[in-house]
Amino acid sequence: MCAKSLLLVFGILLGLSHLSLSQNWATFQQKHIINTPIINCNTIMDNNIYIVGGQCKRVNTFIISSATTVKAICTGVINMNVLSTTRFQLNTCTRTSITPRPCPYSSRTETNYICVKCENQYPVHFAGIGRCP
């Protein structure tokens, strides 16, 4: 294979890897970042992105913030869990019983530090509240 062909293949792969990362960041935003402090857990958790293996997700934490502020946690971080240096307003929805959809949830609000998994300077996984595992 000639050098130009290898360069082309490498460029395509690099472009696809960036697309994959942006999808993970986009999914993180959909699942965890919300701008309004008033959340109805029973309504929001009935969305299909919170259904795992046909079952309602047991727990999900929402970060009440802008995506820009949350993304800043990962500035300069390539691949590791990072604890925020500032506290965030959080709303955690917890399933209260195993029933068919729509599942019932309780809501808990708090202000605390968050731990996120960073990949190539983007948050891709909510890892914890108050400390990193």
UniProtKB/Swiss-Prot annotation:
Keywords per UniProt: Disulfide bond, Endonuclease, Hydrolase, Lectin, Nuclease, Pyrrolidone carboxylic acid, Secreted, Signal
Pyrrolidone carboxylic acid carried by residues: Q23
Main location: secreted
SUPFAM superfamilies (UniProt xref): RNase A-like (SSF54076)
GO MF annotation list: carbohydrate binding; endonuclease activity; nucleic acid binding; RNA nuclease activity
Signal peptide: 1-22
Entry-linked Gene3D superfamilies: Ribonuclease A-like domain (3.10.130.10)
Subcellular location: Secreted
PANTHER family: RIBONUCLEASE (PTHR11437), RNASE 3 (PTHR11437:SF66)
Family designation: Belongs to the pancreatic ribonuclease family.
Known partners and oligomeric status: Monomer.
Name by which UniProt lists this protein: Oocytes ribonuclease
Protein species of origin: Aquarana catesbeiana
